[in-house]
């Protein structure tokens, strides 16, 4: 089916912003003081709400001794940075070391283990920590696991898209929401691609996805600096999805490739291989660029997931790490009104961290 036509940004953007601020002042404050489930989830799908998250969650070791401590904030998004280790074929998790893991993940074999033990573990342990935390919190709202694949997929057989699927499915066993889940209709048949499924709003009901994780992958900074865009993980994995779908093996897919970076119009038009475009329904972009795009409601109207980063960097800029709670709430409300699905922040300091458990209606 053809991709949806872009809508122009709704008139009266200043009224929308004012409404967002009013929501923050009146409704969101009450929501922040109440349990995370103050919102009646039964009438919303996954694409109908906005959650708040933590940028580079694995790297905040001073603020969150363990990854589980970050999850305890009620965050709707955690971020992991992976390196395909060329020496041993493993997936390291660190910000800048391509040959070692530097993070707050531990080796756990049960939910009792996620707050103890040696940190600086590989990706499998980070995913295990998330899984065990979710199993211990089965009524938690769904968690978006954002993975920046710093140097892309690796040269080892254990670092291919197929192997990565198995890896994620194994370590998030029983809790991961997959592309096949989105594609499958109520009668068991499949939509022809992810775009058709998303625009039909076939995402699961938000309440039914409690205790689940959804994984997006984006191209990494190193990969972008040294490789042709045609080899980046977004395009490689989108082609992988097509191959799995055509072979009747789409149930093996574990993650959603994300279009990285905002631009005016449909960002998928950058892909010269038009067959890839309908396999992207997750978008990841800077909050400032997202707001200035001019058509943010397009993401919401078509039920795409929009992850926005650096929430502080929208005019007027806020503190990047410790805004007032009122300012943080107003910013999240504004981005929710503008159609963001997940608002990524570095607000791990009080009082701004009080916003992390918020889940708001989107749009």
Positions of the model-derived regions?
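Secretory targeting and sorting signals
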Residues: 1-38
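Catalytic cores of phosphodiester-bond hydrolases, prominently lipid phosphodiesterases
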Residues: 39-363
